[in-house]
Amino acid sequence: MKNTRLFMFAACTLFLAACGRQTVKIMTPPDASNRVLFGAEQLQTTLDKAGYQVMMQQGDTTFSDPEIKTILLTEVNDTTLKKEGFHISMTGNLTRVSGRDGSGVIYGCRELIDRVNDSDGKLNFPEELKDGPEMVLRGACVGLQKMTYLPGHGVYEYPYTPESFPWFYDKEQWIKYLDMLVANRMNSLYLWNGHPFASLVKLEDYPFALEVDEE
């Protein structure tokens, strides 16, 4: 009986705490792309951590409850926006995040996420904001190389095996790294790998660079 009372008390406490949390609804169209849904998921995670009660709604995007803070994520064919650009606008409790494409929606969501994180969890969203990347390709370079020769090798060449590069096969780490790239508005990843052969190009001015016998 005592355990039952404790359980009921804990359940009531959690219920009352949840009731005291501000509700935020995130709406996406029924045909939302994977990128739009990814942006919604990242926004939901941030709002959850900030203490909000988040409602996810995919399908009907009608703004029907003006008392609830609502965020609508959509892709729009707006030629005034750059590729991967976005437009944030507010009307009352409705915040629209419109992206020129799926990536634009993600970057619009990241803008809201940054503002939540920078304001101690407050929903200080811009009333009007248009933005987009200046450069087409933005990315990071990861080196698949080592600082020393492998035993028995006289050049920088390596087999890409779990033994030689265990981190390269760490899926969980890669997911975190890719999420970091998204947070920094990057859209490409470059792997700088050593060539599997010592050299393949013969240069007349640099004959000593040819370490593989022509025969």
Model-inferred region functions:
Residues 42, 46, 79-85, 90-215:
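Feature activates predominantly on carbohydrate-active enzymes
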Residues 1-23:
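Bacterial Sec-dependent N-terminal signal peptides
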Residues 11-13, 56, 173, 181:
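Generic alpha-helical secondary structure signal
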Residues 11-13, 67, 212:
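Prokaryotic Sec-type signal peptides and long signal-anchor helices
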Residues 5-7, 13, 61, 84, ...:
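Short non-domain terminal segments
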Residues 19-92, 122-126:
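Acidic, contiguous N-terminal accessory segments
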